[in-house]
Amino acid sequence: MADTTVEKLATEVGKSVERLIEQFSQAGIKKGQADNVTEAEKQQLLDYLKKQHGGENAPTKMTLQRKTVSTLSVAGNGGQSKDVKVEVRKTRTFVKRDANEATLKAEEEAKVEAEALAKAKAEAEAAAAVKAKAEADAKAKADAEAKAKAKAAAEVKVVKDMSPEAEAARLEAERLKAAQEAATKRKQDEEAAKAAETARLLAEEHSKRWAEEERQRLEAEKNGDHHITTSKVARAAEDTSDLDEEKRGRRARNKSNAKKRGGKDARDGREKHMRNRSTAPESMAHGFNKPVAAVSRDVRIGETVTVSELAHLMAVKATEIIKQMMKMGSMVTINQVLDQETAQMVAEEMGHKVVLIRENELEHQVLKDRDDEDGIKQESRAPVVTIMGHVDHGKTSLLDYIRRAKVAAGEAGGITQHIGAYHVETENGMITFLDTPGHAAFTAMRARGAKATDIVVLVVAADDGVMPQTIEAIQHAKAGNVPLIVAVNKMDKPEADIDRVKSELSQHGVMSEDWGGDNMFAFVSAKTGEGVDELLEGILLQAEVLELKAVRDGMAAGVVIESQLDKGRGPVATILVQEGTLRQGDIVLCGLEYGKIRAMKDENGRSITEAGPSIPVEILGLSGVPSAGDEATVVRDERKAREVALYRQGKFRDVKLARQQKSKLENMFANMTEGEVKELNIVLKADVQGSLEAITDSLTGLSTDEVKVNIIARGVGALTETDATLAAASNAILVGFNVRADAQARKTIDSESVDLRYYSVIYNLIDEVRAAMTGMLSPEFKQQIIGLAEVRDVFKSPKLGAIAGCMVTEGTIKRSAPIRVLRDNVVIYEGELESLRRFKDDVAEVRNGMECGIGVKNYNDVRVGDQIEVFETVEIARTL
C-alpha cells in the first residue's frame, strides 16, 4: 500500500497541516508538509490521541465511597444533652496505570539514571583531562626553563661586560614570571582536584541508592508479601485511618466539652473512650493449614441413604463416592438410593468408621408398647385349617358340606376366586377354615394361606389323582413346616382309585400311615358326606398334638387374609386374629395403612363388637386398602400409628425406587437391543386384592418378545370415570373382574369408544387376552410353489421378445404369477409371467402335462432346458 503524505492525510481527516504536524511532533514524530506517513506512524499517532482523550490506554479509575455514621452528644436547653447522628461521607478515586505507562515511566527513570551516570563519567573524564593538561604544561614549562637557562648561560659567556643593574632587572623579571606560572599551575591543580572529588561523591551517592533499591527488591521477593496491594487490606487500612481521624476529632470535641462542663463529664468521656477503643488490627496471615493426616469420621448410616447424603456425612464430594463405587464394580448416580450394607462398605473402604442406626425406632417403640407381657395367661385356641388342592377337586364343596351352607353356588363358575375364611362349631370344638383358590394363577394366595395356618388339608380327587396344583400345595405345606392331612374326595364315584392316589402322593414325599408314613389320610365324599366326621376328628386330634395356645386378653394381633375397596364402605380388610381380642374402636396399624375400627363383621355379614384368637373378621375404618399378608397390630396412640404408617410408606417408596433404578441399570443393554415391541395396554380393576395380584401375574406372564402386556393401571373397586379416561388416552382395554362401571364411567366409555370387558372367571380373561395378543403378532408369509414348466423351444415375437415353448411338468401355471427362471437348478432370474398362451389363445392357467407358450416380463435370455418355476405367497396364521 502506498504511503500518504502529511498534506493528504490532513485533507482526509479534516485538519490543517500545521495542526497535524504539531500533533505528530507531540507524538514524538517529526514530519514536514511533504513527508510521507507510514501505517506504523499513523498507528502511533492514533494511540497518542486515544491516550490524550481517555481512550483504551487511558488509566483505569475506581471510585470508592465510604459512609460513616456516628453519634455526637450535644448539650441542649435545660442542661440536658441530646444525641445527634453525624454522617461522614468520603469519596476516594484510585487510578490504575496501564502497563504501557508503567513501562514508559520505568524507561524514563532508567534514562535519567543513565544520563546521571554519563554526566558523572564525563565530569571524571574532564577532571582527568585537566590534570593531564596541567602535567603537560608543567613539563613544557620545565623544558622551556632548561632551554632558557642554557641560553642565558650562553649569553653570559657572550656578554660578560653586562652591568649589575641590568642583571638585577633581568632576574626580577624572571622571578615574577616564575611566580605567575606557579600561581596558574596551583589554580589548575585545585580545579582538577575539585572536579575529581565531585565525580567521586556523585558516583558514591548513586551506588548507595542502587544498592539500597536492590536490597529492598530482594527482601520483598523473599517475603512474598503480595497482600499489601490487595483491595481488602487497602480498604481495611482506609477504614482504620477514617476511624482514627474521626476519633481524633471526637476526642478534641469531648475535651472541649469536658472543660466546659467539669469533672464528671470528663471522666465519663474518658470511660467511653476506653470502651470504644478499637482492637488491634488482625493479622494478614491466613490461619488455614492443609491437613497432613487422613481424617476419620464416625458416619451414621440409616437403612437407606442417597449418594449425595453419604457424601455430606463423610465431608467429601459426591464424585469421590461415585468413583469409589465404580472401582467396586457398581454404576450409580448422585441421587441414587443405597442400602445400608452398600453404604457401609463404601464408607469403610474410604477409611471412615460406620455407626449403623435404626430409623424404625418409633415403630419398634409403638409395637413394644402393648399388653402382651410374658406373665399373661395363655389359653387353648381353635386350629386354623387351610384347604388346598387342584382346581375342581372339591375343596369348596367339602367346606360347604362342613358348614352346611351353599358357598360353592355363589362362586362364579363354581371356582373359588379369593380366600374364604370361616369358623365352624363342631361337637368336639371350633375349627377355622381358609379356603384357597386352586387355579394356577393364585400361587401367592396359597402361599399366604399356608403361612397363616396351623394345619393343611390337601384335597385330592380320587378319580383324578395328583395334579400340578396338588404338588404345589405339598411344597407350600413343607416350606411352612405345617402338618399335612390328605382328604381323598369324590369317593362316591365308581372311578375312584385309592391306591393310585397313595402311590402318586408317595412320589412327592406324602406317605400314608398305612404305608408307614406320618400323614393322615381321610376318604371323604363332599356329595354324600361320607368320612367328613372322621376328617374333623383327625383335624382336632392333630390340633391337640400341636398344643395350640394364644393370649385371649390383651391387644390383638393378626394377619390380613384379604382386602378390597367397597364403594359404600371404603377400604375393607379381612383379618385373621392370631392373639388377643380385637374390639370395635381399637387403633389398628396394618402394613402401610392405619385407622380406627368403625365396624366389625363376621363371615356371615353379622355385626360383632369383638373377636378372639383364630376368628376371621372384616374390619372397616382403615386409611387405605392394605396388601394381603400384611400384619395387623393394635396400638395405643393413633398419632404414633399414623407416623409409623407414613414412615413405612416412605421406606417402601425408597426401596421400590432403588429396585427400579437397579433394574434400569442392569437391563440397559437389553433395552438397547430390544426391537420394536408391540404393547397391549390394559387397565385392570378387580373386586379383591388377591385376585388382582393373581390376574396381574398371569397377564404379565403372557408377554413375549414381540407382544408385551402392559398393565398401565390396576386397582380394587368399581370402574370409575378416571379409569375410562385413562384407558381412552392410553388406547387400552378396560377390564373389570367381578366389578362394574358406574354411570359416569359408562358415559365416558360410550363417548370415547373404549373397549370394555367384564369377566367373572379368570380362565376366560386369560384366554381372550391371549387371543388379542395373537391378533397383534406380525403376519408370517411363506412362498409356495404351484407349478413347474420345462422350456422345450424358444421363439421370437416382435411384441413380446423371446417366447418359451414349455411343457408343464408339475402343478399349474397361472398368468401374472411371480416366477423364477432356473438354469441347472440355479435361480438366474426372478420376475413376473407376462404372457401365457396355448395354441395362440391367451389362457389364465395351464395344467400339468400340457404345452404352452410363456413370455417372461423384461427378460429375453431364455434357453432350451431352462425351468420356469411359478409360486405364490401364502400368509400363515401365527399363535403364541
From Swiss-Prot:
Residues 414-418 are annotated as: G2. GO terms for cellular component: cytosol. Its main location: cytoplasm. Residues 380-549 form the tr-type G domain. Residues 389-396 are annotated as: G1. Residues 525-527 are annotated as: G5. Residues 489-492 are annotated as: G4. One of its GO terms (molecular function) is GTPase activity. It comes from the Bacteria. Keywords: Cytoplasm, GTP-binding, Initiation factor, Nucleotide-binding, Protein biosynthesis. GTP binds at residues 389-396, 435-439, 489-492. Residues 435-438 are annotated as: G3. Residues 249-262 have a biased composition (Basic residues). Pfam families: EF-G_D2 (PF22042), GTP_EFTU (PF00009), GTP_EFTU_D2 (PF03144), IF-2 (PF11987), IF2_assoc (PF08364), IF2_N (PF04760). Residues 180-194, 202-228 have a biased composition (Basic and acidic residues). It is found in: Cytoplasm. Belongs to the TRAFAC class translation factor GTPase superfamily. Classic translation factor GTPase family. IF-2 subfamily. PANTHER family: TR-TYPE G DOMAIN-CONTAINING PROTEIN, TRANSLATION INITIATION FACTOR IF-2-RELATED. One of the essential components for the initiation of protein synthesis. Protects formylmethionyl-tRNA from spontaneous hydrolysis and promotes its binding to the 30S ribosomal subunits. Also involved in the hydrolysis of GTP during the formation of the 70S ribosomal complex. NCBIfam families: IF-2, small_GTP. This is Translation initiation factor IF-2. It comes from Shewanella baltica (strain OS155 / ATCC BAA-1091).
